[in-house]
Regions:
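Asp-box/WD-like beta-propeller blade repeats and closely related beta-sheet repeat scaffolds
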Residues: 6-88
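Aromatic- and Gly/Pro-enriched helix-to-coil junctions and flexible linker segments
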Residues: 265, 298-303, 312, 353-357, ...
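Multi-bladed beta-propeller domains
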Residues: 15-32, 70-85, 120-139, 176-206, ...
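Short, conserved, GDST-rich strand-edge loop motifs in beta-rich repeat architectures
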Residues: 1-8, 46-63, 100-114, 153-174, ...
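Loop/turn-rich, solvent-exposed surfaces of beta-rich toroidal or solenoidal domains
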Residues: 101, 145-238
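Surface beta-strand/loop "capping" patches
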Residues: 202, 213, 264-305, 421-423
């Protein structure tokens, strides 16, 4: 922080302290930059507050950072990630890709969901590297590739509430497994102690030694900041896979972290850009949606289409907790994009908006979601995003077979009737109640009131508050592990069972049933908006958040605002 408005920026300085200068030069008065890393081609990846997002579980009081790609030669910049919560610590892997930590909890438990991702430097092929679909570890921070190794990396596993950034030092190898302890090769300094899965929010409270910011010297020796016991100082240590822990630097009244090795290293390969910035869409290809644990046991031919929605994330210092969008409905707005067909052999190909966090739900013939993605995929402009199936193992190779979708042009989205919009109870569900229910549920007599209009101090209508208890759903804090297919089928909801059994001769149309299923599949939300205010504190002072988010997205994300 060197500017009067106390914004963070990334600076470059020579080892002797001379030549101090900003590495990222951008004229926007409200943007901050941190966690910078050099790319092999001279460009820089950094984290920025460019999304005007706040951490939803604390009502946006903490800003969220997403990644940008910056070119010092011409000062051009492009946004790379469109993630719900924070990105941390991007670093170049030995193969030229970028790995980083992503915090996500769209319908997931928010204190077990900081996972390791990897992508190309231009943002393409962004996918999970370690920890997706598992409760352990809660968080993996400070990841660094092991020199000369094709896949292994070191990281710090930690909890969420309680001790949140330092923790246990683990060597990972994703080729051995990508969940829980499957790919954990060794804990330092406990080489002979098996690593056991422990599902606990405050994962490393009372655990010693505590480590933070490891730097590999090779695949066996590491520099790291450590605090060996509750009474020790934070110092710099040389540690190794043989359980040696040697103090290099420690001083009373000081704390040393972030050791950086000064040496000449081999530059990783430079991966050419694959984006086509003249395009507004990405192509998505699924080879066989029945592959993978997501649809395990589902008979072929069951999936008829995919329902797509985009996420609209919480704003800075804006109400966004569990009691905003609905009762146990999640943190984010779900914006309906439309549906696309699935071929008879389970293959799919379609086009959808680029630079947009998209979530997918496979639907059966009745329009019911068989599975929930509970995450998102973001295609870059002109990118072909491909996967083998539904939550398949990332170590699985493509199936050597020709599929129908690969021989066809991509399908266009079939838009929702009325166009793309946020799913809102008043617009989608209330009209069904008005037609079929309020003759009896009119606020008179014993039948509870299902009329719209009246709102309480949180903005909830009487009809929503009376109806949602009859919907069975996982809520906004669902299990990290992949759900069982049909685990939250609408038939498990008392509302649906009552209507199908027969309720005073109430009959819904096919369209109304699909709308009701959609509501249940989205976790029964109420509101489809945020009350984002103009902020009064720096660096956001004076900006209308909703307008500013759109402006920055249009300018730095290829017009995707």
């Amino acid at each position: 922080q060197t500017q009067d408005d106390k914004r963070w920026n990334i600076y470059e300085v020579n080892l002797d302290g001379t030549g101090f200068k900003p590495l990222v030069e951008n004229d926007e008065p409200d943007l901050e930059f941190y966690d910078g890393t050099y790319l092999p081609d001279g460009r820089v990846i950094a984290i920025s507050n460019i999304g005007y997002q706040g951490v939803p579980c604390v009502n946006g009081s903490d800003a969220v950072g997403n990644m940008v790609l910056y070119d010092p030669k011409d000062k051009s910049m492009r946004r790379l990630t469109f993630d719900q919560d924070a990105n941390w610590n991007p670093v170049i892997m030995n193969n030229g890709r970028v790995m980083y930590t992503r915090w996500e909890y769209t319908d997931l438990t928010h204190y077990y969901s900081r996972i390791v991702m990897h992508m190309n430097p231009d943002g393409t092929e962004n996918k999970a590297l370690y920890g997706s679909g598992a409760m352990f570890p809660n968080s993996t921070f400070d990841v660094q590739p092991l020199p000369g190794h094709g896949s292994a990396f070191v990281g710090i596993i930690s909890g969420h509430h309680g001790v949140a950034r330092s923790g246990r030092m683990i060597i990972f190898d994703p080729t051995k497994g990508r969940k829980s302890t499957a790919g954990m090769v060794q804990e330092i300094p406990h080489r002979n102690r098996p690593i056991k899965e422990e599902i606990k929010d405050q994962l490393v409270n009372g655990v010693w030694p505590q480590f933070i910011k490891p730097t590999p010297l090779n695949d066996k020796y590491f520099l790291v900041a450590a605090k060996l016991d509750p009474h020790a100082l934070w110092g710099l240590y040389l540690v190794d896979v043989y359980d040696n822990v040697t103090c290099l630097m420690q001083a009373e009244g000081e704390g040393y972290i972030s050791p950086i090795l000064v040496r000449k290293t081999k530059t990783p390969p430079s991966i050419p850009d694959r984006v086509k910035l003249n395009e507004k869409e990405a192509t998505f290809f699924i080879q066989d949606i029945y592959e993978g644990e997501g649809l395990k046991g589902i008979p072929r031919g069951t999936v008829k289409s995919l329902r797509l929605h985009a996420y609209e994330y919480a704003y800075v210092k804006t109400r966004s907790d569990h009691n905003w969008h609905g009762i146990q409905s999640g943190w984010d707005i779900k914006r309906m994009l439309g549906t696309v067909p699935v071929e008879e052999d389970g293959s799919v190909i379609f086009k959808a908006p680029a630079n947009t966090p998209i979530s997918i739900q496979p639907l059966d013939k009745d329009g019911v979601a068989i599975q929930w993605m509970r995450s998102w995929v973001t295609g870059q402009p002109g990118e072909v995003v491909s996967c083998i199936g539904c939550h398949e193992d990332q170590n699985q190779i493509a199936i050597p077979k020709r599929v129908i979708a690969s021989q066809k042009a991509p399908s266009a989205l079939t838009l929702p009737e009325g166009g793309t919009r946020s799913f809102t109870f008043d617009l989608e569900v209330q009209p069904i109640l008005d037609r079929a229910c309020i003759a009896c549920h009119n606020g008179e007599g014993k039948a509870f009131d299902l009329r719209g209009g009246k709102k309480d101090k949180l903005g909830y209508g009487t009809s929503y508050l009376n109806l949602h208890p009859y919907v069975h759903r996982q809520g906004g804090e669902g299990d990290m592990v992949v759900l069982q297919p049909y685990e939250y089928h609408p038939n498990t909801s008392e509302l649906v069972r009552l209507l199908k059994k027969g309720h005073h001769n109430v009959k819904l149309t096919d369209k109304e049933w699909k709308t009701l299923y959609n509501w249940i599949d989205y976790n029964a939300p109420d509101k489809g908006y945020f009350n984002a205010n103009v902020l009064t504190d720096l660096p956001y002072k004076g900006f209308d958040q909703i307008k500013r988010r759109k402006e920055l997205t249009d300018k730095y994300a290829n017009g995707a605002g």
